[in-house]
Amino acid sequence: VMWAQAVFNCNAPDRGNMEVLAKYGTPEQQEQWLEPLLAGEIRSAYAMTEPQVASSDATNLELEIKRDGDEYVLNGRKWWTTNAVQGRCKIMLVMGLSNPDAPRHRRHSTILVPRDTPGIKLVRPLRVFDNFHSPGGEAEFLFEDVRVPVTNMIKGEGCGFEIAQGRLGPGRFQYAMTLVGAAQRCLELMCARAEDRVAFGEKLSKKTSVQHEIARSRCDIEQCRLLTMQAAEIMDREGVKGAMPYISMVKIVAPNMAQNVADRAMQVFGGMGVCQDTLIPQVFTLARFCRIADGPDEVHMSQLAKLTIRELTG
């Protein structure tokens, strides 16, 4: 389960970056970066989150993108940048402040920065729950007078927020689908363990408390699976804008569901459930991480409430 996205070349952030380049990239940008990404020849990174601001509000971002003749100069700091510490990462999509005096949602831009550009400095690798996370790892970077050609700008100055929103919407579906599959695997492991393990003279599967945890987990997984399928169907039919309530719903529901199922599986496994002998700790870590990544629960709850009130009151 945990390596399936790598096998099918749809890992985050590559999938989202490929969508950005396919939708907004110039033919030259697509030839240079999209084609090798689609072929699985290289990896990419998406640098958005910053340590010094609340990055759940994308309009807070402070990394400076300043034009200087035929180049843009980048100065600032990014962290939780996935993939950028591995050797196959060749390109970074960096979101930063380019037009500070523009309206709030037109201040930022997204620009292509080759990973080997002078001035990109690795501050430190980052670990989730003190463990290496994701196939590409996470890291904090400092950008000091990083220069790239003006032709590396994606779509145009001031389009960064639009690009980020379009990119993150489908990504939240990917999280949901991944977590449904991961939770299903935890349930399978939990059932096998309950049938195999004997305590106080009977199998764990005969104990009412364990039965209830298994039943509750199956209900939770199926509810989330159906919600995700419904959300994807609406996304296909109506696009990102029409699916906005469902994007928030799956982003809220799936990580919480998977975290709860993994927690129950841990409890059934006992000590084995918290060590490296099963993937359950990985699922728990991923689920908890996803409650913050791509927008925390609280942001999506508020967004969903606003959309619901507007929809139901006219």
Where do the protein language model's features map onto the residues?
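A short core secondary-structure module
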Residues: 71, 75-123
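Short Gly/Pro-enriched turn/cap motifs at secondary-structure boundaries
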Residues: 52-56, 82-87, 100-102, 128-137
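Alpha-helical interface subdomain recognition
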Residues: 1-2, 10-12, 16, 24-29, ...
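Short, surface-exposed charged micro-motifs
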Residues: 62-64
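A short, Trp-centered hydrophobic/proline-enriched beta-strand micro-motif
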Residues: 40-49
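Cytochrome P450 core scaffold surrounding the K-helix E-X-X-R motif
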Residues: 122, 152-157
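Flexible, small-/acidic-enriched active-site or ligand-binding loops
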Residues: 60, 118-147
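Flexible, glycine-rich active-site loops centered on histidine and acidic residues
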Residues: 18-24, 46, 101
